[in-house]
Amino acid sequence: MYNPPPPSGSQGNNNYYRQPSSTPGVSNPNPQANQFLPPPPSNTQAPRPGFPPSAPPPSAPAGQYSMPPPPQQQQQAGQYGMPPPPSGSGIGTGVSLVKDQQISLSKEDPYLRKLTVGLGWDVNTTPSAPFDLDAVVFMLGANGMVRQPADFIFYNNKQSRDGSIFHHGDNLTGAGDGDDEVVSVNLQAVSPDVTRLVFAVTIHQPELRRQNFGMVPRAFIRIANQETTRNICRYDLTNEGGTNTAMIVGEVYRDPQNPQNWSFIAVGKSFPGGLQFLCQIFGVNAS
């Protein structure tokens, strides 16, 4: 788990992210012991074999998770079935953020209800194998961990159980300008016991392909009002990844004093171990 960042508007030193002492890729049975502070659509792509299974069915035995499943607030079918906005769309440029900077989304746009979260990157043109980067979202409770496996949103689990988050699909190449992957968020539908939405990007099969984030220049995340297409903020990462294979790009989190309000922090923190490592520190069983 990890604690909330400083109040919106301040800049921290990113020390609330601390790596756990357990071995990357091994599920941590005791998250309390190791504190960790702080997309064009395709619905027909076959699931990738061997890595994390989709969320268990709603009929999973009671008590399987440390917290109860979220209230059943499933959205109408097709509410998020539309394609994501065109690449690079949005009115204006929004506030340009630097690493560790925070911004109150609710103050910047008092009528904000739904977000478009666009993530993009360019890749070097000379690697031996094509790049495949994946955007993922972790829905965290107050303890800094997912409440259940369904709170991990990725290419094989595109919609959250409460219907508030929809991943528009995996871009296998990262080609072209603008957004490479898009996530839609209905803030009003996020379960009340979810306090943080962590947006990360990982490299698929980095060891096999001999790739890392040092080969991925010009990555960014942008936040826009989905209903008006107005860009609220954007964070451009510059050589943040080094030899690492997973990166937390930013987080959308509730205001502790007013849970109806939301803020964003530009994180830009990279880690070794790829997607498995992120799953470990946020309590997702990736075995």
Curated annotation (Swiss-Prot):
It comes from the Eukaryota. Residues 49-60 have a biased composition (Pro residues). It is found in: Nucleus. The keyword Disulfide bond does not apply. Residues 60-83 are annotated as: 2 X 9 AA approximate repeats of CABP1 motif C. Residues 1-94 are annotated as: Disordered. C- repeats lie at residues 60-68, 75-83. Belongs to the CAPAB/TerDEXZ family. GO terms for molecular function: cAMP binding; pre-mRNA binding. Keywords: cAMP, cAMP-binding, Nucleotide-binding, Nucleus, Repeat. GO terms for biological process: mRNA splicing, via spliceosome; nuclear mRNA surveillance of spliceosomal pre-mRNA splicing; protein splicing; spliceosomal snRNP assembly. This is cAMP-binding protein 2. CDD domains: TerD_like. Possibly a heterodimer of p31 and p34. p31/p34 could also associate with CABP1A/CABP1B to form an active complex. Signal peptide: none annotated. Pfam families: TerD. The gene is capB. Residues 16-35 have a biased composition (Polar residues). GO terms for cellular component: spliceosomal snRNP complex.
